[in-house]
């Protein structure tokens, strides 16, 4: 496989250099946080492999690696909820990606919510761990 990304030579180059040198984990994945370009709201968390990151950069449409299906997928391929990239950032260690995307009037979550984080976990004393009820988050908006 020919890499389009620079080899990670030293920490100074990774943290302060001008070249993309993403660090994929032992499974060949890098975590991705995706937010709404218009609102800044958190939409989802996913993973990319080398091919998904490359395709996302080249096409401006988000591609993820599905850990459950073990295959590359273009967001919206089945649901129609496409994510168009407005900006890509990488953290200081280059081991985590942040996507800022346009989802139009669509959803991000495959079950139809704008955000995959549509449920809220209550804070305070836990009475029964097996029956801790989760509530509706303030961002709960179904498309």
Each language-model region and where it sits:
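Glycine-rich, flexible loop/turn motifs
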Residues: 15-20, 61, 68-69
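Short, structured beta-strand-loop surface elements
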Residues: 62-122, 126-127
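Short, basic/aromatic recognition patches
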Residues: 2-27
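Conserved active-site carboxylates
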Residues: 128, 132
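A short, polar/charged loop-to-alpha-helix boundary motif
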Residues: 50-66
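Residue-level detector of conserved catalytic or cofactor/ligand-binding positions
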Residues: 133-143
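Short beta-strand segments
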Residues: 20-49
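Short, charged/polar surface micro-motifs in flexible loops or helix N-caps
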Residues: 37-39, 50-53, 94, 104-106
């Amino acid at each position: 496989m020919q890499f389009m990304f620079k080899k990670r030579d030293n920490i100074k180059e990774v943290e302060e250099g001008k070249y993309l040198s993403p660090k994929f984990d032992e499974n060949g994945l890098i975590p991705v946080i995706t937010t709404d370009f218009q609102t800044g709201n958190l939409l989802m968390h996913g993973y990319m492999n080398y091919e998904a990151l490359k395709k996302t950069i080249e096409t401006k449409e988000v591609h993820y690696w599905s850990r459950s299906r073990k295959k590359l997928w273009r967001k919206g391929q089945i649901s129609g909820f496409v994510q168009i990239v407005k900006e890509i950032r990488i953290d200081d260690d280059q081991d985590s990606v942040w996507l800022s995307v346009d989802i139009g009037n669509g959803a991000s979550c495959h079950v139809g919510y704008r955000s995959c984080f549509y449920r809220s976990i209550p804070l305070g004393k836990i009475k029964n761990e097996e029956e801790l009820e989760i509530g509706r988050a303030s961002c709960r908006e179904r498309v």
